[in-house]
Regions:
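Hinge/lid segment of periplasmic solute-binding proteins
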Residues: 102-154, 179, 205-207, 292
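Extracytoplasmic/periplasmic substrate-recognition and gating elements
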Residues: 37, 59, 63, 91, ...
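Conserved N-terminal structural module of periplasmic/extracytoplasmic solute-binding proteins
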Residues: 34-113, 123-126, 171, 255, ...
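Extracytoplasmic/periplasmic solute-binding protein
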Residues: 140-149, 179-228, 271
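A structural signal for short loop-to-beta-strand junctions that line the ligand-binding cleft
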Residues: 87-88, 94-96, 126-162, 191-192, ...
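Short, solvent-exposed loop/beta-turn-alpha elements that line the ligand-binding surface or hinge
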Residues: 118-130, 136, 170, 197, ...
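Glycine-centered hinge/linker elements that transmit conformational signals in sensory
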Residues: 182-185, 225-255
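C-terminal capping/gating helix-and-loop segments adjacent to ligand/active sites or protein-protein/ligand interfaces
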Residues: 148, 314, 357, 371-426
């Protein structure tokens, strides 16, 4: 899951702005690179469920005769990883593959450093296997330069089942139900909502709130089209008011808390609910918790008919070694293989990005995710997660983070003031 260098713990962030001089030096250094057959993979899957998934990928690649070199960079948001990647590319020593997402793939493509894996994609029919809303993100100038590994749903609400039973409540489907349940939980001495005080977690929570309050059409106009009137309009103000209201139901120890620590609060029963993408399910699985029994996975209030997607992907970098290039293409092929798609996504909490997969081994949360993905695709309510690098530029996303983080932490700022700031942030270059 991941953020930019100044937002240090988000499920992803990347910038790719280099000078021509630096790239020239990089090319010269790369020309003398060692002829190692090892495939170095930069990723930020370092928490329980995610780390297990990385191990699966390593094992499968090595079964193909390639050597995996692990380049794991802690910091769930990927900001630290992208800083490390930028340094390596400038030095002319990029990893063979790196976990990169959304518009950032295009930015790296513009720098001329990405390797086309179109031959693998064509021979394996990726255009028929990957939904078009996702395959378009993986291509640069019509050629695949990245491979997707999964589909995460972001607009989930995770609930401790016992906590709900203690207050005789059902999973909330509306915001009125949500706050009524939160009041009951608070009176029972249970923290209603677990969150980490990091800007990406605040932004992700707001993203789900905005989708639930305004619907998919509003969401697209505001966060895909960046329409100024919508960003500072009454629906946005209502979404911001709802978002701020949630804060009263969180604990005072949230500063700096990582997302998986917040998930742990729900798992243990210290807290009742968490807004988080379905990478959180990996944490429940590692703790041997069962969906429907120990915990519930439901769409955020009001967002039942929409689906916010977040796709993990690996982009491939140009290298001078034919051996490494073979390993890169082996890795690309592996990422879309049915075997890896099944094992990986069972560990990760996500669903396969490869269409037509047998989901019989997947749990109830995954089945709901897959069904809702398909129905949202048909209804036009499938939307990219702006909070997770899938649609806006890193600059705009970072500016949104700042606005929402400041609003969350400033009790005196009004929702209209925050909405006006979002409209300005959308113009960030």
């Amino acid at each position: 899951m991941q953020t930019q260098p100044r937002h240090l713990s988000k499920p992803h962030r990347q910038t790719a702005k280099f000078t021509a001089c630096a790239l020239g030096v990089a090319a010269l250094v790369a020309a003398g690179a060692a002829h190692s057959a090892e495939v170095e993979v930069l990723h930020y899957w370092t928490s329980g469920g995610e780390a297990k998934s990385a191990q699966v990928l390593k094992q499968m690649l090595e079964e193909k005769g390639d050597t995996w070199k692990d380049f794991a960079v802690a910091g769930g948001g990927g900001g630290n990883a992208m800083t490390a990647l930028k340094t390596r590319v400038i030095a002319g020593n990029p990893p063979a593959a790196a976990q990169i997402k959304g518009p950032a793939i295009q930015e790296w493509g513009d720098e001329g450093v990405l390797l086309s894996i179109d031959d693998v994609a064509k021979s394996e029919g990726w255009d028929k296997l990957i939904p078009p809303q996702i395959s378009s993100i993986m291509k640069y100038k019509g050629q695949y330069v990245a491979a997707p590994v999964n589909v995460h749903r972001v607009n989930w609400l995770w609930i401790n089942a016992d906590a709900l039973k203690k207050v005789n409540a059902q999973a909330p489907a509306t915001w009125d139900e949500f706050f009524k349940t939160a009041d009951a939980l608070q009176k029972a001495g249970i923290t209603p909502v677990a969150i980490g005080g990091q800007s990406w977690q605040q932004a992700e929570t707001f993203e789900t709130v905005a989708l639930g309050v305004g619907g998919a059409a509003f969401y697209k106009k505001a966060f895909v089209q960046l329409d100024q009137a919508t960003l500072k309009g009454p629906t946005m103000v209502k979404a911001l008011e709802t978002f701020k209201k949630i804060k009263a139901y969180t604990d005072k120890g949230q500063t700096g808390r990582d997302w998986n620590m917040a998930t742990g609060m729900v798992i243990s029963g210290k807290a009742a609910m968490q807004f988080m993408g379905d990478w959180a399910k990996g944490e429940f699985s590692v703790a041997n918790k069962v969906p429907g029994k120990d915990y519930l996975c439901v769409p955020g209030p009001g967002s039942q008919n929409a689906y916010t997607f977040n796709v993990d992907s690996f982009a491939f970098f140009k290298v001078k070694s034919p051996d490494v290039e073979k390993g890169q293409k082996d890795l690309a092929s592996l990422l879309l293989s049915p075997k890896f798609q099944e094992i990986f996504n069972l560990n990760k909490g996500s669903i396969p990005v490869r269409q037509g997969m047998d989901l019989s081994k997947f749990d109830a949360c995954a089945h709901r995710s897959a069904a809702d993905f398909t129905s949202s695709q048909a209804k036009g309510t499938l939307v990219p997660s702006w909070a997770h690098d899938m649609v806006v530029t890193p600059a705009v996303e970072g500016a949104f983070y700042d606005v929402l983080g400041n609003y969350w932490n400033d009790d005196n700022e009004t929702a209209q003031e925050a909405a006006d700031k979002l409209a300005v942030a959308a113009k960030t270059q």
